[in-house]
Amino acid sequence: SFRLGNGADLALNGALNYSYATRTFSNMENSRYGVYNKVEDKPEYYYKYTDDQYQTNVKVGALLNLAYLNGKNRYYFRNIFNQIGQDKLTLREGWQNMSSLYIQEKTEYCYTSRSTYSGQIAGVHTLELGTLDWDAGYSYADKNQPDRRIVNRQENDMVGDAHYGQMQIDQNEIRRDFMKLREHIASAGINYSCTLREGSSFAPELKVGLYGEYRTRDYRTRAYFYRFDTDNLPADFAYGDVIDDILQDGNYGADKLYIYDDSDNRNSYKGDNIL
């Protein structure tokens, strides 16, 4: 804190934080159970997968508060900001047994970030008759998932086929999802209080105030599938490495490998509210 030339006091409080961490989760079981097998006394699975997950997490935060005190008047300026970012890679292997047994491999890569900010200006004034306080604030929050990528592959179980036992992709099994959420909140309030008949045995307190708030939110999603026409691609196209063989410039075309927009506007919305 500081004492200013006019006799007022100024106080400052600030902080910064940063963290970086990597995490690995190995051999996690991801299963769904059906009806328990009482005859063999063991669980029955609808699917049973083993996941390996690799995460990188980054967190950043900042805090800055100011206070100005001058006699019977006090003013405050408050700010806080936080952001979290996460890179995540999940590798999944296992099987699904709904109508038949399917050996599967699944890969997911996504980056997700979340940010929040809150700021406020406030004042407190001691009057001859009572106390007056007011504040005005703004808050912001967002969540961003700019490119979630999912690849699903399944083992060819057709006995006698040239690619029997190999992992392959099918239509719609390479997908990309995009999501963004933003929210803004602005608010203001004022309050007045005073004690009536101060000093007497019966001294009621009068309080009045006003408050207003405006909130707006915008949520947007997009979804894409990769589809392909096997008649215009190599016979072993679906069995290649997804990055090195399939998603190559030479494979793209309206009658070859193309991107299908599967976005549904019902999954997106925009709204506001006044209080």
How does the language model describe each region?
Residues S1, V159-E173, R220-Y269:
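Flexible glycine-rich, low-complexity coil/linker segments exposed to the extracellular/periplasmic environment
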Residues S1-T90, R114-G119:
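Transmembrane beta-barrel wall of Gram-negative outer-membrane proteins
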Residues F2-L10, K72, E128-T131, Q145, ...:
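Short loop/turn motifs that connect adjacent beta-strands in outer-membrane beta-barrel proteins
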Residues Y18-T22, N70, F81-G85, L127, ...:
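Transmembrane beta-strands of outer-membrane beta-barrel pores
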Residues Y36-K48, G94-E105, A162-I174, Y252-S263:
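Flexible, solvent-exposed coil segments and beta strand-coil junctions
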Residues V58-L64, S115-I121, A136, H184-I190, ...:
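Hydrophobic, lipid-facing positions within transmembrane beta-strands of outer-membrane proteins
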